[in-house]
From Swiss-Prot:
Disulfide bonds join C45-C85, C49-C80, C59-C66, C68-C101. It comes from the Eukaryota. A lipid is attached at S194 (GPI-anchor amidated serine). The GPI-anchor is attached to the protein in the endoplasmic reticulum and serves to target the protein to the cell surface. There, the glucosamine-inositol phospholipid moiety is cleaved off and the GPI-modified mannoprotein is covalently attached via its lipidless GPI glycan remnant to the 1,6-beta-glucan of the outer cell wall layer. It is a lipid-anchor; GPI-anchor. Heme binds at D63. This is GPI-anchored hemophore PGA7.
Amino acid sequence: MHFIFYLILLVSAADYGNFGTYPKVPKTASINGFADPIYDLLPDCAKECVKFSTSNTPCPYWDTGCFCVMPQWAGLVGQCVAQKCKGEDVASARFLATSLCSVVGANTWMMPASISSMLSTAAGDAKEVTTIEGKTAKSWVTAPGSAAGSVVSETGSASETGSSESAQSTTTGSSSTGSSSTDSSSSSSSSPSSSANFAVLQTGGIGSVILGFMMYLLV
């Protein structure tokens, strides 16, 4: 146990110590680093789902990429979306979350496989989303200086993968019922501030992913 604790400390130091090797994320947030960039774009049914306390993670409240690889937190978010939203609203929320994780370099939205399955069931036959506000996933997700067309997945656990989806996966910019969670372009329609937030988000270090995996082993 002590070995794992010290390993986490070392990984954290390596991840945050060399700031010049990877782009930056804003070190501030009104809700948290995961919610702020996508909140205005999320379908209404999913907005409360990104407001969970982050105290069950070691992440700074502003660290977007860290939340992407914390299954104990992402699982709560995913479960909430699956319970409160349906159809295209679910697809929209998943697209926004996985796209965000791609932008910051985590390249995965890590959660228990059972939660990923719940999301798939809640989405049903809804088409996947590749467009929000008339922008393609590729152009909208890629931040300045990052590789274009990067693929992001929604992973189950270290050993198990739930339903995966790429940042370029399907699109239907349509809204669903008020209590459904999908790729609703309409509920998230005009949000210049959110788009601006995406523009400044950049990739994190591989250490965040390792840190997330270590924390997953502990919970």
